[in-house]
Amino acid sequence: MGPGLTLSGMTEQSSLFPAPAPKGSALVAAKIKALREQLNRWAHEYYVQDTPSVPDAEYDRAFQELQALEGAYPDLVTPDSPTQRVLGAVLDGLTPVRHRVPMLSIRTETDTEASGAQAFDARVRRELKLPPDAPPVEYVAEPKFDGLAMSLRYEGGRLVQAATRGDGEVGEDVTHNVRTIRQIPLSLPAGVPRVLEVRGEVYMRRADFDALNERQREKGDKTFVNPRNAAAGAVRQLDSGITAQRPLSFFAYGLGEVTPAAEGGPDFGTHFGMLQQLKEWGFPVAAQVQIAQGASELIAFHQRVGAERDALPYDIDGVVYKVNSLALQRQLGFVTREPRWAVAHKYPAQEMVTRVEGIDVQVGRTGKLTPVARLAPVFVGGVTVTNATLHNLFELRRKKVRVGDQVIVRRAGDVIPEVVGVVPAGAGLAVLAGSDALVDAASSADGTAPAQPLAGPRQPYVPNFRMPRQCPICGSAVVREPGEVNHRCSGGLFCPAQRKQAVLHFAQRRAMDIEGLGEKLVDQLVEGHVIRTLPDLYRLGLSSLAQLDRMAEKSAQNVLDALDKSKRTTLARFLFGLGIRHVGEATAKDLARHFGRLDAIMDAGVEQLLQVNDVGPVVAEAIHTFFAQPHNREVVEQLRACGVTWDESEPAAAATLPLAGMTVVLTGTLPTLGRDAAKDLLESAGAKVAGSVSKKTHYVVAGADAGSKLAKAQELGIPVLDEDGLRALLRGAPPNAGGG
């Protein structure tokens, strides 16, 4: 059902849970029927209601029991059994299906503003000949899913056919694939019409799409452009085994042919009532569906769903408004094969097509180099986009982006625009006439024919992009560590692009602890070119600070006092404050203990650095590279010249430290020691302070309000110390375990 059971394995016969084999075919049939009903109920709770009532293991046990029973009694297997969702045969082609009730498209309102809803409401009122003072028309407002329209035909309560929209008159039979979609019931409860065609949308959730693409990348296979194309491709597979591995979902939103089993069949009266009935029959219906009175509530719905759009677990490209009364729908009728009683009110497109005019490199505040596509301006996601990220060199090469290519650009909400992929010649993709919106070349999302196929042949002699060897900002060497995908500037403190982050890191409490030097002040200092390097902090004067915005003389003096106080520090804090990649607090303390002197660290080779506790090849290389840059050494010397100082010592032998090799966890509030002070004492004694309790933990130090870490320690039998026990441990005396 969940992660514990893959669809690809559901058709294999299993002997793990042999059937209890009740005697008598009637008893066997009853057992099989009960198992099917139970499994269908559990699957509905899990996939449709999202409220599972049993663990996956229980579902798996019942499923395998049903498999075993059906294997022993194959004459009792029915098409609607949960075991029959994936069929083994691979088809030669898809069979055309003529829709008994045409799957007509809904007119699209291209005005994405509030006036789009007002225009639709005005047309409806005009067609109904309503006077100005008539009550508002009642509508149903729904999300417009960005997926593949589907018709599900049930006869006698069993799914017998699933067909794509096609041209509205003739689609394709994809029953073998749709059966694998767990949200679509294979059978319906008693009392449904004899013939029931349910219309809806097959789609792929964003999280499922991301996971699918990650699996494709891991296998070295082609990735998908967007969830809609992934869903459409999965539905049209000839091998249902492949479709079963693609995580598809379904929403119902309407009906096609309905033939009541007898007089007195369901008479909905309203579109909303029909949706409620579909939910009762076991079909998923979007939670956002609501009744709206008149244009004002349509506008409010459009705005609310638009604001929530990026938080939804699936893609939508607009909302749909439908007159709620079915009688009024019949009165309004159709025009040029589109219903007058419904409209799709779009949002600004989130994916568009444009051309790459160049590829630049940006340097981020942590030194990461990011290739950025310079684009022909395109309106996407509500703004004009001229640049889009390509993430890193490996992603750029995987997508095979070159200057001059036509590319798909995506922007959702506040997310940085990105190049999704190149539109190759003959890819079967197109843009709608009069826009840059990407659609399938065969048919667009709303059934209209696109006018501009993509793309032309790639321009000859366009070289592949190469990452620069020197930082485009400061000229420092560009490096990429083994196993890393990102290239980085090694300039560190010297690089202007990294300056703000470097200053904030240097000033933080666990580094140089410069009180009052926050983000807003640093922004002014760096952007106003008041400081260019870290030593410039210690050259600040009262006049240069007092002239800044919101900086009175007293506040300026407080900052100067804090700077002066910070000059007296420790070697570990100073090392941490330098912002060397991969060197955190603990590593800085290990370096300080091991070498004792800064000059020894600066002059150490990689092999010497590898002798430090918990320093591996990546960290050692990062430290060596940092101090190999002359400008980084210059910054260090200038800081010393400004009066930054600390006590140096002889190199410590780690084995002589009293707590060398021990792992200690802190939890709760100690009576007199703060957490940072306790951590410093432990690390100075050679202990490693961990954030979680495991079997490798030697002691847990617990204070007031200790939580789950204390419970975990007691469960594992790990000694628990109070503050007195900690102090005894630090003195080398036997601690009194059991405190706290």
Swiss-Prot record:
By its UniProt entry, which PROSITE patterns does this protein fall under? BRCT (PS50172), DNA_LIGASE_N1 (PS01055), DNA_LIGASE_N2 (PS01056)
Q: Which InterPro entries match?
A: BRCT_dom, BRCT_dom_sf, DisA/LigA_HHH, DNA_ligase, DNA_ligase_AS, DNA_ligase_CS, DNAligase_adenylation, DNAligase_N
GO terms assigned for molecular function: DNA binding; DNA ligase (NAD+) activity; metal ion binding
Stretches for region Disordered: 1-20
Domain BRCT: from-to ranges:
654-740
Q: Where is the active site?
A: K144
Xref: Pfam families: BRCT (PF00533), DNA_ligase_aden (PF01653), DNA_ligase_OB (PF03120), DNA_ligase_ZBD (PF03119), HHH_2 (PF12826), HHH_5 (PF14520)
GO cellular component: a single term: cytosol
Q: Name the positions where NAD(+) binds.
A: D56, A57, E58, Y59, D60, S105, I106, E142, R165, E201, K322, K346
Listed A to Z, the keywords are: DNA damage, DNA repair, DNA replication, Ligase, Magnesium, Manganese, Metal-binding, NAD, Zinc
Catalytic activities: NAD(+) + (deoxyribonucleotide)n-3'-hydroxyl + 5'-phospho-(deoxyribonucleotide)m = (deoxyribonucleotide)n+m + AMP + beta-nicotinamide D-nucleotide
| Cysteine pairs bridged by disulfides in the record | none
Could you give a single Gene Ontology term from the biological process aspect? DNA repair
Q: Kindly list the residue ranges recorded as spanning the membrane.
A: none
Q: Give binding positions for Zn(2+).
A: C471, C474, C489, C495
**What EC number(s) has UniProt assigned to this enzyme?**
6.5.1.2
What cofactor is this protein dependent on? Mg(2+); Mn(2+)
User: Which top-level group of life is the source organism from?
Assistant: Bacteria
The function of this protein is: DNA ligase that catalyzes the formation of phosphodiester linkages between 5'-phosphoryl and 3'-hydroxyl groups in double-stranded DNA using NAD as a coenzyme and as the energy source for the reaction. It is essential for DNA replication and repair of damaged DNA.
Family of the protein in this entry = Belongs to the NAD-dependent DNA ligase family. LigA subfamily.
Name the chain's protein. Answer: DNA ligase
What organism is the protein native to?
Acidovorax ebreus (strain TPSY) (Diaphorobacter sp. (strain TPSY))
